[in-house]
Regions:
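Bacterial N-terminal signal peptides
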Residues: 8-18
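Boundary at the C-terminal end of the N-terminal hydrophobic targeting segment
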Residues: 22-27
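Solvent-exposed N-terminal domain segments of exported/luminal and surface proteins
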Residues: 30-187
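Proline/serine/threonine-rich low-complexity linkers at boundaries of modular beta-sandwich domains
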Residues: 213-225
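Structural beta-strand segments of beta-rich domains
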Residues: 239-243
Length: 405
């Protein structure tokens, strides 16, 4: 089983493991909800120039891509009641976003049902996966490691529970459902990219003909987070890989995980930065500040003052490729209207609520410390052979590890 099939299979198991009855619970009150999901992503490759990075991103994305961090935004509006025949909604934005005066919020078109494939006869074959799991920042492997997860020696349910690990509080953003109007951005009409210099700071106004007016302001603490910037990466796949990063001013904590695949044994190697035994699959997305604080106390998430970590020596020595996934958790902005009256005897009911959540993520291919030397070598390739560029070599590595996270 190749690495991508293994990753897809593990992801399917985790999807089931992370489901909980609370995720399907209906809100007690018909409250209009508006979620703003903010993210900054940065891919870093030690030793590569901006020109090579641009070429690599172009190969990966199939188009010419700019170098540097990428900002993304997801807007989701959910209002009680069925939408009118001609629904309209928009989010008026501050000038600092540099994206015009407003962003249209559209109701998604219903997808036509796809005729299912003919069911296959017989019982599906149980996937064969053997995973070596390590944890903790440090130059050497900790005691009792690795933990071996083998589907040949454990049930699928036990494997799923072992891989699920910790998760944050259930987050259920607005989504299409019966009896509710749902609109979103980006959408089929507007899919513009968020400029690198875009800022959310300022006043925001959400309005439409199927939801109440929503007005709120965003301050600097809840603006786009600074990108993940690795300031130092030392060590090859056979070594202890030490990495440092620039502190993100608005981060509430950090978490890192790395994954690779042994070419010798076919085993998947997984590592996380947690001091406690924690795979980390459930921690690579948005987390509320209360969850981040709890995980810091449990020594699972690194505190906001931490700026360095190390992967133990030799755990990826037989890997054909490995990658580090990194996340900085951001603060949340939660606003509800109208405000509660001081007198508790006065009846009160919220009309709308806004949640703005934030994260900054980074991806770092590991074991590329020799790329600079390869670029500066004077050895000429055999006649007739076109030398493989560092970007092409890196693309092969990324093709192996894409989809893991």
């Amino acid at each position: 089983m190749n690495l991508l099939r293994t990753a897809a299979w593990v992801a399917a198991i985790l999807t089931v493991c992370f489901l909980s009855p609370a995720s399907a619970a209906e809100p007690k009150k018909p409250l209009t909800r508006y979620w703003v999901s903010v993210a900054t992503h940065n891919m870093a490759i030690p030793g590569m120039s901006q020109g090579e990075m641009s070429g690599l991103q172009g190969m990966i994305l199939g188009k010419v891509a700019g170098v540097g961090p990428k900002k993304t935004l997801l807007l989701q509006l959910g209002a009680p009641g069925n939408p009118p025949a001609s629904p309209e909604a928009a989010h008026d934005i501050p000038p600092g976003m540099e994206m015009g005066k407003s962003l249209p919020l559209l109701i998604p078109e219903r997808e036509k049902p796809v005729r299912g494939e003919e069911p296959q006869e017989g019982k599906p074959e149980k996937p064969k996966v053997r995973m070596l799991f390590y944890w903790g920042c440090g130059e050497t492997v900790g005691p009792g490691q690795p933990r071996v997860l083998d589907t040949g020696k454990m049930s699928m349910a036990d494997f799923g529970r072992a891989m699920a690990g910790r998760t944050g509080s259930v987050q259920a953003p607005p989504s299409p459902r019966a009896g509710w109007a749902y609109a979103e951005w980006p959408n089929r009409r507007d899919q513009k990219e968020v400029p690198r210099s875009s800022s959310l700071v300022g006043g925001h106004f959400v309005h439409g003909n199927f939801s109440p007016d929503i007005k709120f302001s965003v301050d600097e603490r809840h603006d786009f987070m600074a990108p993940v910037e690795f300031t130092s990466v030392k060590g090859g796949l056979a070594d202890s890989i030490a990495f440092e990063w620039k502190k993100i001013p608005t981060a509430t904590g950090y978490f890192a995980m790395a994954i690779g695949h042994s070419e010798k044994t076919g085993e998947t190697i997984l590592w996380s930065s947690s001091d406690a035994q924690e795979p980390g699959y459930g921690l690579m997305g948005y987390l509320p500040p209360a969850d981040v604080s709890r995980f810091i106390r449990e020594k699972v998430v690194m505190g906001p003052e931490v700026t360095r970590c190390a992967i133990p020596r030799g755990i990826f020595k037989d890997a054909g490729g490995a990658a580090l996934q990194f996340i900085g958790y951001g603060d949340e902005l939660n606003i509800a209207w109208p405000p509660k009256p001081k007198d508790p005897k006065i009846p009160h009911e919220y009309v709308w609520a806004v949640k703005l959540r934030n994260k900054s993520t980074g991806m770092l291919p590991l074991g590329q410390e020799g790329m600079r030397e390869e670029r500066t070598t004077k050895e000429k390739p055999p006649a007739g052979d076109k030398p493989e560029s560092p970007a092409e070599k890196m693309k092969k590595t990324l093709d192996t590890i894409r989809g893991l996270f």
